[in-house]
Amino acid sequence: GPIAAFRYLLTGTIGASMYLLGAGFLYSATGTLNMADLAETVKDLDGSPLIILSVGCMIVGFGIKMALFPLHGWQPAAHSYAHPAADPMIAGVMIKVPAYAMLRFFFFIFKEESMVMDMFFDVIGVMAVCGILFGSLKALRYSTYNKILAYSSIGQVGYIAMGFAIGNFYGLTGAVLHIVSHAFMKSGLFYTSGALKYKFGIHETTQLGQVYRQMPVTSLTMTVCALSMIGLPPFAGFFSKWYLALGAIENGQYLFVAVLIASSLLSAIYFFRVFEKLFMESKTAFERKDTAALMEKSAVGRRLELPWQLMIPMLVVIAAVILLGLFNSYIVDDILRPAIMEGALS
């Protein structure tokens, strides 16, 4: 625990320092940090060593903060040792804000045809592909629920970076949709992790046998969010991946499409292994020797599933994941299309 906290403190400080260093180089080259002024000034400085150095520092700084491969070292330990109430915040907010900041910085300041953006697309594309495959494959190795979710997040952040690397309307739409949808999906899964610890002290997926009988809402939340993470319709996760695939096809980036399909299959494998234990394990969690003692000492025992204060967030997450999927066309046409076409791609 203390080691993980110190690692996060150290890497977080490095990430923030790299961002500030990049901002310093940018100011040295342009004399301003106003984004509107920067967008005009950098046109004449494309290829400048200070601008290139600034962009490199920004990629590292944002990459550390959003746990983008290979700058993700702090994230698995943070999720493994953090308090259950903090995990949804880490997954839902802390790694999404720098992703949005990266979008604003690169696409609102630099033009798509510039040397800086060519470098950005190449670097972030490699990081995205490696991160998606690394996170998905590492998640297969673990039976600890939080470890699975932590490494899954590394892959999911890769989807956001892939949208940036695609760089067209569909790619950025997929990236923004995934920022929002993953915030709900992964928060919901970490809510279920906290609920399992609170109710039964469960950490391992091998301890989930027939838990759905005692915790139906928790199990439903886990199922909806996991299916959305895999990318099954009509949930939110399907549509963000759909737009990423459309953008990659439009650009002729078929490697990205192959990686999307492969990672979705890997996600299906590790989540269906969880479902197998949750719904199909013949021996119930109460009968298993490794969990019986924990359950007898449970804070809630065998009464109601959870206090209502803990149930409401999970119900909100279920509704959000479904509604974001059902109404995604309205979100894209009425909100994202004007913002992206008149802002990032103007």
Predicted regions and their residues:
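Cytoplasmic/organellar membrane-interface segments at the starts of transmembrane helices
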Residues: 82, 205, 215-218, 273-346
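Hydrophobic transmembrane alpha-helices and their helix-loop junctions in integral membrane proteins
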Residues: 1-242, 246-272, 276-277, 282
